[in-house]
């Protein structure tokens, strides 16, 4: 089931990115981060109450790890990703994001001595190659300074995300995923709000929630990208090897290219078709492992 959860994560995140792009002309990256994370926290709480999931017996050590994971993986990494997206655009961001799967392989080996098979490495090579082929389109208007900071922020975002989710994998094995998600995103949300208050004052926080919750595209993106995909994402890491989950998650970049044709009126070029085919073959190879 872990592989299915990881694949569904890619599908949900792809929908979310399209919706976030449609909403991005209304709010800045920090505002989008706060709205989507608050939506996720509310969704997790409502689901826990409806399903009557009992509070797990987290140790103090577990709570500290979850809090640090939330601060790094949600509070910092998400902000770095959105800042990178703003500086270098979606095309280059997609290529920088290919560092995610190799980061998971390395960190999973360091944390858990998890060995990745040859099949997974081969599938990863094809999928990442497909992403580069289908998304590469260097924007001429980007300065060298923007390129450097955008790539740096993007790479750090992927590495921090990988480290933060793997740090809570042992906790997820014996505890409900929804509580893990709630604590991580609760800490990330509080961190982002505090940052906004220090940077721009209380008034912008209220404006952010007022405008954000009236933006139907942002709410849709939050539902798919923060509520559904986070639950599926954590479930994928709970029920399968970290390396397999990571490479299935990486397919979201290719799915975004397909969805952009229908929702954003992008053109499905030969280059994109080749990239999609390479990624599909790579996913099949990983699934046969």
Regions found by a protein language model. Give the residues of each.
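Hydrophobic/small/kink-forming positions within alpha-helical transmembrane segments
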Residues: 14, 45, 71-75, 102-106, ...
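Hydrophobic/aromatic residues within the transmembrane alpha-helices of Major Facilitator Superfamily
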Residues: 11, 15, 42, 71, ...
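Residues that define the loop-to-transmembrane-helix transition and helix capping
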Residues: 30, 91, 117, 178-179, ...
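Membrane-interface interhelical linkers
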Residues: 1-31, 35-68, 78-88, 136-153, ...
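Interfacial helix-capping/hinge residues at the ends of transmembrane alpha-helices
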Residues: 17-21, 81-82, 93, 104, ...
